[in-house]
Each structure stands twice: as structure tokens, then as C-alpha cells.
Regions:
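N-terminal secretory signal peptides that target proteins for export/translocation
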Residues: 1-5
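Bacterial N-terminal signal peptides
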Residues: 7-19
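Proteolytic maturation boundary segments
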Residues: 18-43, 222-262, 275, 308, ...
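M16 family metallopeptidases and their MPP-like homologs
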Residues: 44, 49-65, 71-75, 89-133, ...
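Active-site SXXK
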Residues: 70-84
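Short, polar/flexible loop-turn hinges at active-site or ligand-entry regions and domain interfaces
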Residues: 82-86, 134-142, 364-367
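Non-catalytic, conformational "gating/processing" segments within enzyme and secreted inhibitor domains
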Residues: 148, 197-233, 437-438
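His/Glu-based metal-binding/catalytic segments typifying zinc-dependent metallopeptidases
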Residues: 173, 242-303
Length: 449
């Protein structure tokens, strides 16, 4: 049967809107509304440049996948570009490329997101394409077979052949013994090898519903211009039932876990991960902000304790970093990654003891006013500079909304960071830097014996 393609009236949206922008101000007007079918919409005005980003966030990711079906959400992301009622396979990307619209998509633990950055008068194109993809994707078996081979090749390139990624995947599976966060977003290879198009269609029908999505628009637009477009293209989609997401809760203290890996790398590497709450699970958001600052204080900047003493001072490590991502629906990890200096002869066990000395020091010796203010200034500057790009603004807005936290909390984040005290840092270290919460990976040089 022939498929009619390119039925969209794209030319109608090549004419610019008139009187789009209002004078820019320091405060960014942000609007929200919900369509009758359940689609939530957040619009933030930013009139500094005549561009806009449109992001459609679905509350479905790798954490929602049952055992044996890892990688479903990421595979579905790929397949949404393989044709729908108005589009042939690959035509969405072709349309965007022809119009100079930057576009892509990504899958994470809790979300799948499709986004475009474009001129304001092109928003109708973005909305029509996204609305069609989210409601009438074909998901044919004959399209899935070659695309699955592409996904498997992507996994080999980005995971199996990447020693850093492989080590991180092993650590994640160890660090999340009770929740689905331990599975890789792209999926385990043995699950990919038995995945089929019928599973994708079931996943699509159960998860891709207006009520399970948030549309985020940031840029040179106004609510008066955007809302009619949203209603025109997304408002006609029928409401449909969908599977509610479940928070991926982890055991608070699963017990100490350790793994030893052997890889052909230049120097031994130490990975540590502590089970901690996220913004979606913390009982007190002050804890989240304390952990965020603690990451900067530990090994998140060149003035942090680990880098200043062990990397630059004693030259024990050649590279160190600590990370804490609070933007999850389920529980998170506080991680430390340290690579031994090539001239060092001490073991990773000894290196880990040195790290523990600094971790325990935070419990008895909280940061002084100057140390804390320096870290706070660095972190706040990073947050404020991140607002320069409309894509980054939309990404954080969508992340907050998709984990069940209002975008207003994002706007208040800087104020909350200013309230964190040295005692908050000390309490966070005492609570979460424990061996009962720890997973460790020792990555040794050489082949597996």
C-alpha cells in the first residue's frame, strides 16, 4: 500500500510572526497550562535572540523497563523517526535539515526527549512533526531489524569498546541492587539481541500518551503566540490511558559492595559510589543542596580537597572528579572517580585509604566560611551561566517537571544553595559517606588473569 508523505502545510510556517518579542527583562516570564488531553506545557520567554527551543519530554526511560527488556525506551526513540501517518522514514530529520532546524533526541533513566532549536515562526513545523510522531508512529518490523543492528553497533562503540563506560556500567549495576537504575540506558546486549518490534509497539502504546508528556518551549516567544499553536497541533490528540511511572527506590544501606576489573588502560582507576537520595526522593531538599555543594568541595573543582591535596599536592592522582546528579525520580549516587598517576607505585587499596581520610575529615572538620563560599560561588556561577543557552534552560525545566518537581524549585535553587551551612555539609558527609552505602570498582591495568 502506498503511503502518502509530506502532507504538512510547511510553507504556512515559513512566514515570520509579527510582534513576537517584548523588551527583554531580567525576570523571565514563565507560563504553564495543561491541555484537555493531559499534555502539560511550560513556556519560558527569553527575548535576547530570535530563536526558540521546543522539547517534548515523555516520562519513560530505562528505569521503567522490566528485567529482560532493557533498552526498550532507547530503541523506541530511534524508531520514532522511521515513519508515521504524515511522514516517511527519515523524513522528519530531512524536513528539519532543509529548514536549518537543529534537532535530536535522547533517552535517560526517567525520560525520553525530542527537541529542536529553530526560528520562532517555524514552531508550527516542530509541533506538527512531534504530534504526529507521538501518536501515529508506524514501528514496522521491517524497519526495526536494520535499526536494531544500528543500536547494537552503537552499544559496541559507546560501551563495549569504551573502557570508561564499561567500568561505569559495572559500577552502576553493583550500586543499584534493588532498583532498575542499574541497567544501562542503551540496554544489555543479550536483551537487544532478542528485542522485537511487537515489544516496541506495546511500549509505545502504554507510555506515549499526552498525559505522560511535558512540552517545554523556551525562547523568543510569548504565551499568546504559542498557546494557539500548541492547541492546534497537540490539542487534537485524544487522551489515552498510560502506565504510571514508579519511583526507582533503592535500599538506603545495601552494604559494602566491591568489584575488580582488568582493562588495557594506562593507569589504575578507582571508582566509588555512595547511595544517596535525589531531588525526587529526598525528604528535605536541604540535603540535596548540601550534597551538591559537597561534590564541589570534594573533587568538583581545582580548589577542592581531593584535587588540591592528592592530585596537585602529592601527585597521587593524575585526574579526579566527584559528581552528584539530583535530577532523578528515584534515588541517586554520589560518585568519585580517581586515576592513579602513572609514576605512582602504591596500590588502589592504599589510594582508597587516602580518599577515606578526606571523606572522614568532612565529618569532623566541616568547611570553613571561605572554603564553602568559594565552592558556593563556583556552583552558583555555573548555574547562572547555564541560563545563557535556551537549550540548557529547557533541559533543566524539563528535567525538574519530569521527576515531579515544579520548575519553580529550579528558579529558587540559587537561593537555596546560599542557605547551606558548614553544619549541613558535615551532616551530609556523616550520613552518606559510610561503607554501608558504598560500591567500589578497582580497575587494574592488564588483561583478566
Amino acid at each position: 500500500m502506498n503511503i502518502l508523505c509530506s502532507r504538512m502545510l510547511l510553507f504556512a510556517w515559513l512566514l515570520p510572526f509579527s510582534a513576537l518579542a517584548e523588551p527583554a527583562s531580567l525576570a523571565q516570564p514563565t507560563h504553564e497550562f495543561t491541555l484537555s488531553n493531559g499534555l502539560r506545557v511550560v513556556v519560558r520567554e527569553d527575548h535576547r535572540a530570535p530563536v526558540v527551543t521546543s522539547q517534548l519530554w515523555f516520562k519513560v526511560g530505562s528505569a521503567d523497563e522490566p528485567p529482560g527488556q532493557s533498552g526498550l525506551s532507547h530503541a523506541l526513540e530511534h524508531m520514532l523517526f522511521k515513519g508515521s501517518s504524515k511522514l516517511c522514514a527519515g523524513e522528519a530529520s530531512s524536513i528539519f535539515d532543509t529548514l536549518g532546524i537543529a534537532q535530536n533526541a535522547f533517552t535517560d533513566k526517567d525520560v525520553t526527549t525530542y527537541y529542536q532549536t529553530l526560528l520562532p515562526h517555524q514552531l508550527g513545523v516542530s509541533f506538527e512533526v512531534l504530534a504526529d510522531m507521538m501518536s501515529t508512529a508506524h514501528l514496522r518490523a521491517e524497519d526495526f531489524v536494520p535499526e536494531l543492528a544500528v543500536i547494537q553497533a552503537e552499544r559496541r562503540l559507546r560501551v563495549d569498546d569504551d573502557f570508561n563506560a564499561t567500568a561505569q556500567h559495572h559500577l552502576n549495576s553493583l550500586a543499584y541492587p534493588a532498583s532498575s537504575y542499574g541497567a544501562p540506558i542503551i540496554g544489555w546486549m543479550h536483551d537487544l539481541q532478542r528485542m522485537n518490534a511487537a515489544e516496541l509497539r506495546d511500549w509505545y502504546q502504554a507510555r506515549y500518551a499526552p498525559g505522560n508528556a511535558t512540552l517545554v518551549i523556551v525562547g523568543d516567544v510569548t504565551l499568546e503566540r504559542v498557546k494557539p499553536l500548541v492547541e492546534r497541533y497537540f490539542g487534537v490528540l485524544p487522551a489515552k490511558p498510560f502506565v504510571l511511572t514508579r519511583t526507582a527506590l533503592e535500599l538506603a544501606e545495601p552494604g559494602e559492595r566491591r568489584i575488580i576489573l582488568h582493562q588495557p588502560i594506562a593507569a589504575p582507576r578507582l571508582l566509588m559510589a555512595f547511595n544517596v537520595p535525589s531531588l525526587g526522593t529526598a525528604q528535605n531538599q536541604r540535603t540535596v543542596h548540601a550534597l551538591t555543594l559537597l561534590s564541589t568541595l570534594l573533587a568538583g573543582s581545582d580548589s577542592s580537597r581531593v584535587r588540591k591535596r592528592l592530585q596537585f599536592g602529592e601527585r597521587l592522582f593524575s585526574a579526579t572528579t566527584s559528581e552528584y546528579n539530583a535530577l532523578f525520580r528515584g534515588d541517586s549516587l554520589f560518585t568519585l572517580d580517581a586515576e592513579l598517576h602513572t609514576r605512582q607505585t602504591i596500590s588502589l587499596d592504599e589510594a582508597e585509604k587516602r580518599i577515606w581520610q578526606l571523606l572522614d575529615e568532612f565529618k569532623t572538620n566541616p568547611p570553613g566560611a571561605e572554603e564553602l563560599e568559594r565552592a558556593r560561588t563556583q556552583l552558583i556561577a555555573k548555574r547562572l551561566y547555564g541560563r545563557d543557552a535556551i537549550e540548557d534552560q529547557a533541559d533543566r525545566l524539563g528535567s525538574f517537571e519530569s521527576i515531579g518537581v515544579s520548575w519553580r524549585e529550579m528558579d529558587d535553587e540559587v537561593n537555596q544553595l546560599r542557605l547551606v551551612t558548614p553544619e549541613d555539609i558535615q551532616q551530609a558527609a556523616a550520613t552518606y559517606f559510610t561503607r554501608q552505602r558504598l560500591s567500589t570498582a578497582h580497575v587494574l591495568v592488564g588483561a583478566q588473569p
